[in-house]
Amino acid sequence: MCSVLRFQRNMASWVKRHVFTFDLGDIQEKRGSDSGSGQSRSTADRYFNAVFGLGLLLFCIVCMAYLSPFLGSDLPQCRSVTMYPSYALVQGFDRRFSRLGRKYHLYLYREAGKDNGFSDDNEIHLDGIPVLFIPGNAGTYKQVRSIAAATANLYYGEMRDALNNNNTKNLDFFTADFNEDFTAFHGRTMLDQAEYCNDAIRYILSIYELSDKYRASGEPLPTSVLVVGHSMGGIVARVMTTLKNHIPQSINTILTLSSPHSTAPATFDGDILKIYNAMNAFWESKFRDRDKDPFYAENVSVISITGGVLDSVLPADYTSLEGIIPSDNGFTTYTTTIPWVWTPIDHLAIVWCDQLRIVVAKLLLELVDRTSASKTRPLPDRMRLARRSLLSGLESSASADFHLWDNEDYIFQPKVAPGALTTAQEMSPILLNVETYDTLNEYNYLAIPHNEPNLRFSLLTSLENLEELHILFCQNYNEHNSNGPIEYSSRCVSPSQDFIHVPRSFENSKYPSESSVGSASLPFKALHFNQTLLSKYDFIKFRKPSKSSFKDEDFVLVELSTTDWQTTVNCNPFQLLLSSAKFAHNASSAPFIQTFRFPYLSSSLVSYKLDVSYTGENLVFEPFIAQSIDSPFETKWHLRLRDSVTITIHSEAPFIPFESHYDKSVKLRLIAPPDCNINLSLSINWYMTLKFLFIRYRLAVAALPLSLVSFVLANQFALYYSSSFFPDFSTTLRAVTSKFWLKLTLSSILLTPILNISFIQRLIHSLDPSGVNSPFLIRKKNIMTAAYYLGIREIFMCWIGPLLSCITLSLVYMLAFGISTLESCVRRVSCYMSTAISKTRMKEIWLKDECEYEEGLVLRRRIGSGIMILAVVLYVPYQLVFVLLFLVQLNTVIKLNINYFNTKRHSNLRNYNSSYLLLMLCVLPINAPMVFVFLHNFGRRWVTSFRSHHNCLAILPIILLVCDNAGLRIPRSHCIERISKLITIGSFLYLSLYSVIYGIRNLFWAHHLVNLISGWLLFTSLDLTSNN
């Protein structure tokens, strides 16, 4: 007992010395200074006003930056689409086949005039390959129409011969109708959708078993379904494989559009986080333990496509598959990377953007195989097709997919005399256009040197018809003749299948998408081979095309170079704070495709500005830049370099795990015409950097204000316990700012490096009360992540902490000012409308020293509490009751100001209830999404199971405390043990610390902490010695 008392005294002494060092006199002095007119403001007030003004200014700048339009390559360039949709309800799929058959529905899409319609028996006889489309959060089943229509038009149209698949077949698109459910906010809804889709796949496969057309065709019946998911629909597709009703091997190809694979976009519901952990653990184990179940490693492919910077619904970084799906089974790509698309796309447009839907439709038709029961090609062929269709072809890993590796369609040519070969050192880039056509030999032979690590072959052309371009890669070949001596010849192959498409860049070109699919202009074609591939061959034979194939602006540029093609620019963000990084392209010594690598610029949070100046007249094309990152596969093309270029990247992002051994460097691949010297300067674009803070830290708007409000409440209760006076929130906030703001700012800076220490991460993980965070670092050594605080790994980004802190202070003060303004208005209105009699009566009833309640009011509060508890147990989620309690607390604050009395007890009641109202206001955004889900389901006349949200204990303390507040009681400041006071203060401090460290990724748990604190406040407000 003595040791416990000694601990209490020591703890109280430490708190008094180090934490709450301002006293009541300071607060009262500030109150008097605020109320007195003409008095000079104190230094503390000026300090607070400076911090508040700075935060408000930063908030306005961030909002203005967020609302400002994108420029250059980040501008949206999607074209509108036309289609003739029709939807056939699959009426047979009802509650007999799925318990959710009344809530959800299944439709079959038919493109009018293309797909087979109803037959004479008023049924649709399917003969294609099944595809299931899963809409996303609040999505509709009709979103399937764009991709499905493009697939039908491509298959039944004139472009069918362009498909690289002799075994392709028409696709039957089924689409799920989820009544626009909010999948991202409610875990139970996500599980329901996954369960329904598994039942739908079972039913879809049974339809084909009954199809007369399929039996007549002699083709094997389908055993799997291709799945296309938009937004959260892509996550539903992956969750499907983890459920018990999943049919084994029924899914082997998943294509997702803007789906947040790596982390949940919203953390309002703990079930969502648990589902993500279980899903990612399941998929990771399937690829890790391939000996037990080889199906996933040998058959399943997952492709993630994201729209990039224009996606304002969720950060594009969240779509990464890194660390979840091996590179042999899937990858993430950006629409700016995809050939023939080359434009960023917003979250909704990604399902209808004309350029993308054509590419996706072509890919789907090339992935399928009607002769296989799985109806898809083998995994290596699917992945190779996906990489060729969705990646730029300039990635470091792209050479593995070139046909030049294993091309055996040999063309035998006569032996070339050694004197006809031109070495790379003797040769300048070969430029062929209308002006130089007659100066070039008809045949040109380029000798390929060996043991040259920097050897590169590059070709760029604007010719429309590649058949006019005759280029061969040859080996010296000895042909044995049985009737005579050995004959020497050359064995050559054509690289025609390895050409990649890059955006057109002439003087009148503005945007990369101007040469995308369906445009009037055609893109450039290019070849780019490294030394490893070239080492298989001895020389290159190039024959110039016919002169009639050249238009005035057409050109062919060929180069075999041994010059170092990559330049490393060793600048870091700290150096860019002081000056810009300058580098140059020298046309006389550098290859026309030169790469500038920035190994220390890898943060997705920082945007850069690139200023370019170049010289040269009559350039055959305008220089352009391919900005790229190898993981994830993001390439962005920049034209019109005379204007400032904005560099935005998606590499190392907050809260996103990444593999540490991958190269995260930013690469700027400059493609320059001959005789064009270029100077480049790179600096930080602060305005665009602030623009991207909002999309990545939206959840901080709920977490950080709750932290500050809790910290101020801890100080309010400390002063209340020491003086029996409960100060108002705004005044305490000013005192806290003047006393602790420098310390808090320093802490917000130091938290970033501290929480990146491996030992600290493990410690924080072990102390996490929610138990839903599962940092990849703990499971795999090569996976890095920062799951706590702001999710930042770079020391340079430590400034984000103080910036968000200033903005948080401004937001909290404006909320407190709003409540104070409401109270002031209520008092003024009450002053005019209330009579002296009613005031006297209310004083007698409400503000008796012994708090003698009217029995009628007490009875009504008890009945109301019982109804709310019963409603939570039987029907509504506790989040809805929280919203109602917020309104009750607001009513209490209003009533306290309607009957205003200038007494200490009334002041305590008013300040305490106003502060608690502000605390509830900070928790309200956390609970609001679940209320939307409930009201949406209620409107659809269906009650989705809220299993984890019917726990009355999750709201009971708040119910009782709010009702207790309505009875005008306040936690006692006297006759209370010292340890109880420390528990109250410590609880608020813990809530404040939790909201900072865990809050952004665990918002749902903040409600439970507030609930526990409310229970404790209720306990301290009880007078256990009283009969009441």
Curated annotation (Swiss-Prot):
It is an enzyme of class 3 (hydrolase). It is found in: Endoplasmic reticulum membrane. It comes from the Eukaryota. GO terms for molecular function: phosphatidylinositol deacylase activity. PROSITE patterns: LIPASE_SER (PS00120). Glycans are attached at N166, N299, N530, N586, N679. It is a multi-pass membrane protein. Its EC number is 3.1.-.-. The active site is at S231. The chain crosses the membrane at residues 51-71, 699-719, 740-760, 799-819, 867-887, 915-935, 948-968, 979-999, 1002-1022. It holds the Pfam family PGAP1. The keyword Methyltransferase does not apply. GO terms for cellular component: endoplasmic reticulum; endoplasmic reticulum membrane. Gene3D superfamilies: alpha/beta hydrolase. Keywords: Endoplasmic reticulum, Glycoprotein, Hydrolase, Membrane, Protein transport, Transmembrane, Transmembrane helix, Transport. Its main location: endoplasmic reticulum. The keyword Hydrolase applies. One of its GO terms (biological process) is protein transport. Belongs to the GPI inositol-deacylase family. Involved in inositol deacylation of GPI-anchored proteins which plays important roles in the quality control and ER-associated degradation of GPI-anchored proteins. This is GPI inositol-deacylase. It comes from Eremothecium gossypii (strain ATCC 10895 / CBS 109.51 / FGSC 9923 / NRRL Y-1056) (Yeast).
